[in-house]
Amino acid sequence: MERPPVQHGAVCGPWDMKDRLGTGGFGNVCLYQNRETGELKAIKSCRLELSVKNKERWCQEIQIMKRLNHPNVVKACDVPPEMDFLVNDVPHLAMEYCAGGDLRKLLNKPENCCGLKESQVLNLISDIGSGIQYLHENRIIHRDLKPENIVLQECNGKTVHKIIDLGYAKDLDQGSLCTSFVGTLQYLAPELFENKPYSVTVDYWSFGTMAFECIAGFRPFLHNMQPFTWHEKIKKKDHKHIYAYEEMSGEIRFSTSLPEPNNLCSIIVDKIETWLQLLLNWDPVQRGGGIDCGRPRCFMLMDQIFSLKIVHILNMTSAKIHSFHLQPEESLHTLQSRIERETGISTCNQELLLEMGVSLDPRKPASQCVIDGVKGWDSYMVYLFDKSKTVYEGPFQSRSLSECLNYIVQDSKVQLPIPQLRKVWAEAVHYVSGLKEDYSRLFQGQRAAMLSLLRFNTNLTKMKNTMVSASQQLDAKLQFFKRSIEIDLERYSDQMAYGISSEKMLRAWKEMEDKAVCFGKAGEIHFLDETIMGLHTEIVELQRSPCARRQGDVMEHLEQRAMELYKQLKPRSPDKAYSDSTEMVKILVQTVQGQDRVLKELFGHLSKLLGCKQKIIDLLPQIEMTVNNIKEADSSLMQMQAKRQREIWHLLKIACTQSSTRSLVTASGETPITSRTSAWSDQSSPQALFSMLTSKDKGREILRHTIDKNTDYQKLLSNLILQTQTTMEQTSLMSMDFSWLNQ
């Protein structure tokens, strides 16, 4: 007997029921929130009276869940005490709540009708593959892997996929392998479908089927048929076949390749096809590729796929994406050579920009193009520009129509069966979304060019400030130098008639004055300053231009209309056998026209950006040369100033020497010496001495002592006069060598 479902808003202690998350074969899963703490828990409760076997299976799921701990397997948690009671003789199961919903919800979105984006596919394969390995290592087979049993959770900005619903899981430690199963048939491995013995490889089949659906938007083998129908048709397929479809004639076709369209780059497609061939092998023994180094080969190949370093480069001159598998330690130059071979743009003309407008560093390896942890060309791109071009002609030819789309465009009123129309319209939605994404990527490339321009403008501003500062300093020094040399020349003229003079020095000073005028020309930066200001104005105008902002609103609106049409078609019953594509074709045509218009504007604006950037590139060497000239002029001016100061100090030394000489001569010259000599002669004549001796009665020794003392003094005075005359002759200004002035 079925238990009535829990009503929305039901209260269980502090826990309020907020939402019903899902209903399974035997249970309901509801979201509860604690009013006091805000904590969220997913509570699974039994809605049916179970048989003894199913009660065991229910309790087994709880036991399995409680012992598992892996980021890609949903965690069991403690049941709140208020809910710790039996329902239909089985307990509740409390689990972590994953707010992103399940994978089926994601796949059902119209934008994913032809598969998920590459980054989403790779992220999902990595997560679910890791979860399956963990279960198998713990000897647990899930047996019911499907999109409904994969939930999504945002964690630190990254989507994490978790496996849920282990109700059908088989614990290998609990007995022999079971041969009966009642899980979802569309994802069921052939041996389970046929009630044959099975192993862990049943999860490989389900995993491969689910991965294929995430890539293509539909299951790999005759997805429109019921399992009982396609099973007989597919069982004889080759082990490398990963895709089967029915043609209009009813003939079944097999393929070893993924169908188009999908969102994978060519490098990933090749690897994924090989990987799917291992998972979708009909033979359960061969499925997974056997064991290599203690691990199934399919997981070894997964590791190889996720270790690939792939750089995706958008050629802005052709709007084409080029993907390159980087070798370990590959240099940037080697990568550029490979780019040249594919694009025809020579390495010297290649400019590779990251999303933020930063140029790649040629000193670093090519792996700088790849961010660790980021996978998929839809999530990270490098933009290629041709430096030899400043005008990008665009727009370019839109992506080509598939055969199906071309068919309905040629005749939009042709009536097609609803199942076939769904596929054609899914391709139409993918095409419209693709045109919008093409524009978005090109706009991102234009934005990278703008950011690069702003970086160049920042360098230009710095160099301009350096130039202006150097020019102002030179001008100030020139003004000082000119004024000081004017004063020096005036003072020199004033004193040369009666003081020191030198024609060589005067000529040298006047030459300095002339050179200073020439140095002033080095500091003339008005033309460059005006040019730079004009570029600044041009850049501001480019930033303010409407083309600097996304112009894809019309395309986004058309994309939404295409998705709405597809959504309206999807639930229609096949009983309404046929319909035309008139409305969808209108959207296709309008989208192509809209893309052509916005691309014309985009490439026109991009050409202006690149032209402005080239002006800066051409201007930078001129500024650098001007700064160097100013610095050289500044240095020469300072050398002249220092030289002139040395001359002035030398003149001062001469003047001081002459002044000292004159003072000495004045103090000990002829007149004083004569007077002193006369006085001495008067006092020292023999008659006076004898008179003094007579009058004062002095002895002969006193007389001799006095005569000797005066004789010494006379010699000293004579020597001093001789030295003064010699010094004056040696320091005569007119006889000096002024050749050092020209050094």
From Swiss-Prot:
From what superkingdom does this record's organism come?
Eukaryota
- Write out the catalysed reaction: L-seryl-[I-kappa-B protein] + ATP = O-phospho-L-seryl-[I-kappa-B protein] + ADP + H(+)
Q: Which parts of this chain are annotated as the region Leucine-zipper?
A: 453-474
According to the UniProt entry, its GO molecular function terms are: ATP binding; IkappaB kinase activity; protein heterodimerization activity; protein homodimerization activity; protein serine/threonine kinase activity
The family database entries (Pfam families) matched by this protein are listed as: IKBKB_SDD, Pkinase
- Which key words are in the record? ATP-binding, Cytoplasm, Kinase, Nucleotide-binding, Nucleus, Phosphoprotein, Serine/threonine-protein kinase, Transferase
Q: How is its activity regulated?
A: Activated when phosphorylated and inactivated when dephosphorylated.
Question: For this protein, what is the EC number?
Answer: 2.7.11.10
Q: Provide the residue positions that the database annotates as binding ATP.
A: L21, G22, T23, G24, G25, F26, G27, N28, V29, K44
Gene Ontology cellular component terms for the protein in this record: cytoplasm; IkappaB kinase complex; nucleus
Q: Which residues form the active site?
A: D144
| BP GO annotations | cellular response to tumor necrosis factor; positive regulation of canonical NF-kappaB signal transduction; positive regulation of transcription by RNA polymerase II; tumor necrosis factor-mediated signaling pathway
Give the family this protein belongs to, as stated in its UniProt record: Belongs to the protein kinase superfamily. Ser/Thr protein kinase family. I-kappa-B kinase subfamily.
Q: What is this protein called?
A: Inhibitor of nuclear factor kappa-B kinase subunit alpha
